[in-house]
A protein has these predicted regions:
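Glycosyltransferase donor-sugar binding loop
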Residues: 60-62, 451-457, 635-651, 665
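Aromatic "clamp/platform" in nucleotide-sugar-dependent glycosyltransferases that forms part
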Residues: 688
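Conserved donor NDP-sugar-binding/catalytic core segment of glycosyltransferases
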Residues: 129-160
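Acidic donor-binding loop at a coil-to-helix junction in glycosyltransferase catalytic cores
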Residues: 208-216
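Short hydrophobic beta-strand element within catalytic cores of glycosyltransferases
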Residues: 705-708, 718
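Nucleotide-activated donor-binding/catalytic signature segment of Leloir-type glycosyltransferases, i.e.
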Residues: 74-84, 472-475, 650-669
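A conserved mid-protein helix/loop that constitutes part of the nucleotide-sugar donor-binding site
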Residues: 29, 431-436, 614-628
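Non-catalytic membrane-proximal stalk/linker segments that position and tether the catalytic domains
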Residues: 1-14, 256, 261, 265, ...
Length: 782
């Protein structure tokens, strides 16, 4: 028998039937037990099929000395049973590459099937035989999983097992392939036709991806292969607490699942699917003999009780202490005292029937007894212990599956070129900017998916969005309800959209916390697939400090391709505060909707506030001066509605209005042209922070005088004494009062209406839809 200890590309592989590919890393003495178990698998196979040629391929990927030592001591178990053993020391430090390396070696030997093994688990005796028999019976390329999984750990044997997991085939009437969206229903050690591995390989992690075994299974499903289950097979799966590549990968939250065709709209929507409620009803039919969806909680007295903590690991078997690692007899006594006494005989009879009906037969009990000779799995009557465990079926339906299936099933959704994330629809300028962007994208034949990542209210923008060709708007409440999908799960779903939707080119984020977190968490992966555009308009600060969008922008700025804003003022502010060179910041003036010109300029001693009621818009700064305004006979008319999403807004100023004689709340308004501009002398906009508010642009275009706080990009469009006044101390009520009184005291010295109109036309000429679309096209590539 020939077995090289290093890889050699010149080796000519001999023809084999089955390859056993075993990946080793830092298993140490655990592989000593695993090799014995695999040897039993080969013996059982060869007793039934003596002419089969079996090859074992072993990779030692960056092994530690302890693993090398035990490989040398353990390889004889394989040498005695296989026809060929080949082992290779490699330095991938990546499970996917180790697996692919061995797969290529096996394919060189023209094998028909490849069994993937890990180096620290145990297997039922006829595991390999049952896999091969099912493959022959299928008569087509196969992917086969074991039927049962028992969990154990590296120190405590089976005491970590709380149940037996029963796997179902992906085409089983009680299982769905779409359930693989939210959970991996299977395990890593699969029996696969070599023809499948010729087409599909493991995706290398490369420090970017994790869950390679989950990934290859969904790739196989996407390619049309069912996942089968071999009856009467069992794996005792060892969950190592430390030192494994899986543990290392799972602890790195920056790693994600690699792209897969499984998540593309066309493939996923083409899979057989039932919704969560239907799956719940269907799975309930499996409660005899197996348990699904935590049904056993209703029958807790019928099953074994398991307790884990940092100081004890106690498993009670009837009245007897089956496994204990408690140092203190006190703890043992207390644990036993608190448990309900169980009738062991009744439990055995009850559960033995369940096990038998579920396919866990006498052969498997015999296998467990043999495996107990390799590794003591429990200190007392292992088979009796197994007999008391409930069997859970790994269906794991989830509302997340429904949401993604519904999303992928939308008409023409696979044509999406632009993903746009907003918080929710409001009547503010940010959403007008969003609608303008969607309109520009729509007119250039882009396909846009707009997702509101926060719950919102009814809004007039909704109808306009839904009428734009190629634009699909999905609201959080309707499509992504918080009761079914939290923000983190929504981020992961959006990441899968970005990774796998075939025509997606741009991710655009406008004030969406989910969107910002998505970029911050997964920027490396996102940038491999799309360009990242952020639209932001002001440096937000309130009484609690910087607002979230302002804070996180400084984190994600390095990852984005472009920051679009509406004025040079904000660009200069960001460059000054952060030291950014500004090359990624692109000011683009937003177009102004047509408005009615002011016709009546006779002084009426009426001023107007129009906008949202929020912590940002400081209406209280004007109301503070109501007595002084009343002395001059100045009336304040207030238009707008409460921003319900603003948690800092307490509504105090609106309640205050009811107590003031010279202030009147006139209700909400739907568009600037609903405002009675001929009945007022000016628009006042007290504000804590601002960009270039749409209400100001529309007021200037209508030739209405404007008083506003000096912040953001407002100095670009308002010039003192010509078309308005800027309040330098924008958080000072007296400063706003002085500006109002100055207007009335100097009204005869201000520009005439015609002069003001010409001035406004000059400074607003960039706020044109054609110019806007030209500049947006430069950002979005047309």
């Amino acid at each position: 028998m020939y077995y090289p200890n290093t890889h050699d590309n010149m080796i000519v592989m001999t023809k084999m039937d089955i390859a056993l590919n075993i990946t080793l890393h830092n298993e140490g003495d655990l592989l000593y037990k695993t090799f014995q178990s695999i040897a039993l698998n080969v013996k059982a196979l060869k007793e039934e099929y003596p002419k089969l040629k079996v090859q074992a391929n072993v990779s030692l990927d960056c092994p530690d000395d302890y693993t090398k030592q035990f490989f040398a001591k353990s390889k004889h178990f394989l040498v005695e049973v296989v026809d060929e053993l080949r082992y290779y020391t490699v330095d991938f430090a990546d499970l996917s590459q180790s697996r692919n390396y061995l797969i290529n070696k096996a394919l060189s030997s023209k094998v028909k099937y490849i069994q993937i093994y890990d180096g620290d688990d145990l297997f039922s005796i006829k595991y390999l035989l049952r896999m091969h028999q099912l493959a022959i019976k299928a008569g087509k390329p196969v992917v086969i999983e074991p039927e049962f999984v028992l969990d154990m750990d590296e120190w405590s044997g089976l005491c970590r097992t709380g149940s037996i997991r029963k796997l179902l085939a992906s085409n089983d009437p009680h299982q769905l392939a779409t359930n693989m969206y939210a959970n991996n229903l299977y395990q890593s050690q699969i029996f696969v036709s070599s023809s499948i591995f010729e087409k599909i390989k493991y995706t290398p992690g490369d420090g970017r991806y994790r869950y390679e075994d989950y990934h290859i299974l969904i790739e196989m499903i996407a390619s049309g292969y069912d996942i089968s289950v071999a009856p009467s097979t069992m794996i005792l799966y060892r969950r190592k607490l430390t030192g494994s590549l899986l543990t290392s990968s799972n602890s790195n939250c920056r790693l994600c699942l690699a792209p897969s065709r499984f998540f593309s709209p066309r493939v996923f929507s083409g899979l057989n699917h039932r919704n969560f409620e239907e799956m719940q009803e269907l799975s309930a039919q499996l409660d005899a003999p197996v348990i699904t969806n935590r049904q056993s909680e209703d029958n807790t007295d019928q099953y074994i009780k398991i307790y884990h903590s940092s100081i004890k690991n106690v498993l009670l078997y009837g009245k007897r202490l089956l496994i204990e690692t408690v140092r203190s007899a006190k703890h043992i006594g207390r644990s036993r005292k608190n448990q309900k006494r169980l009738n062991t005989r009744e439990l055995k009879e009850l559960n033995l029937k369940r096990l038998s009906e579920a396919g866990f037969n006498q052969e498997m009990f015999d296998d467990i007894r043999q495996l107990n000779n390799i590794e003591p799995l429990a200190t007392y009557d292992t088979a009796g212990f197994i007999n008391l465990l409930p069997i859970y079926t790994a269906i794991q339906s989830s509302g997340l599956n429904d949401i993604y299936y519904r999303l992928c099933s939308l008409p023409d959704i696979d044509r999406t070129t632009d993903l746009l994330l907003i918080p929710h629809l409001t009547k503010g300028g940010a959403d007008k900017a969003m609608v303008e962007l969607c309109q520009a994208l729509s007119e250039h034949n882009r396909s846009v998916l707009v997702i509101g990542t926060n719950a919102g209210d009814d809004n007039s923008w909704r109808d306009k969005l839904n009428k734009l060709p190629g634009v699909t708007f999905l609201e959080r409440d309707d499509y992504f309800p918080v009761s079914q999908i939290n923000d983190k799960d929504l981020e992961i779903m959006l990441l899968r959209v970005i990774q796998n939707w075939p025509k997606l080119e741009y991710l655009t984020v406008m004030n969406s916390g989910v969107g910002y977190n998505l970029i911050n968490e997964w920027h490396d992966e996102i940038k491999r697939h799309v360009k990242i555009i952020v639209h932001d308009w002001c440096y937000g600060v309130n009484d609690c400090g910087l607002i979230f969008e302002t804070t996180i922008l400084s984190k994600v700025y390095r990852y984005i391709d472009c920051l679009v804003t509406d004025g040079d003022g904000y660009k200069k502010q960001l460059m000054k505060i952060h030291g950014w060179d500004g090359r990624k910041i692109t000011p683009i003036a937003l177009p102004i909707n047509p408005v009615n010109l002011k016709q009546d300029y006779v002084i009426k001693h009426h001023i107007m506030y129009a906008g949202r009621f929020s912590a940002q818009k400081r209406l209280d700064l004007v109301l503070t001066s109501h007595r002084e305004l009343a002395k001059r006979g100045i009336q304040l008319d207030i238009y707008g509605s409460v921003d319900k999403a603003d948690r800092l807004y307490d509504g105090r100023d609106i309640r205050w209005v009811e107590q003031i004689d010279n202030a009147r709340y006139q209700g909400p308004f739907n568009g600037f042209n609903e405002l009675p501009i001929d009945q007022v002398d000016l628009l006042i906009l007290p504000t804590q922070y601002e960009g270039l508010p749409n209400i100001v642009l529309e007021a200037l275009k209508a030739n209405l005088f404007v008083i506003a706080g000096k912040c953001g990009s407002l100095p670009e469009v308002i010039e003192d004494g010509k078309n308005g006044f800027l309040v330098d101390d924008n958080g000072n009520a007296e400063a706003y009062l002085e500006a109002i009184l100055k207007f009335y005291d100097r009204s005869d010295q201000l520009l005439s209406p015609d002069e003001r109109k010409k001035f406004n036309q000059k400074i607003l000429h960039e706020h044109d839809r054609a110019i806007y679309q030209k500049h947006i096209g430069e950002v979005y590539g047309w």
